[in-house]
């Protein structure tokens, strides 16, 4: 998964459920690059079924994957080297 997509997954996993992911506030809070990068990453992640959007709320539908991302982001453990 490309870095921009990983960053968005980490951000949404941290939030649990995220609204307005392309807003300046969300982008700043999670140190994302730009709204266009977030939009492109979200589109691709939804194509891969790694991200779901319902009523303008984005979330990771697989709870185990979401928990894995939360733990990975919060502990700085690298399970699979890049």
Please place each PLM-identified region on the residue numbering:
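Short amphipathic alpha-helical interaction segments
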Residues: 30-47
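Small/polar glycine-rich anion-binding or flexible loop at a beta-alpha turn
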Residues: 26-29, 44, 58-60
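A short, conserved structural fragment
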Residues: 46-56
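Winged-helix-like regulatory helical subdomains adjacent to P-loop NTPase cores
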Residues: 1-35
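Short, amphipathic alpha-helical interaction segments positioned at domain boundaries
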Residues: 64-82
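Accessory beta->alpha helical hairpin/"wing" motif in late/C-terminal subdomains of nucleic-acid enzymes
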Residues: 55-67
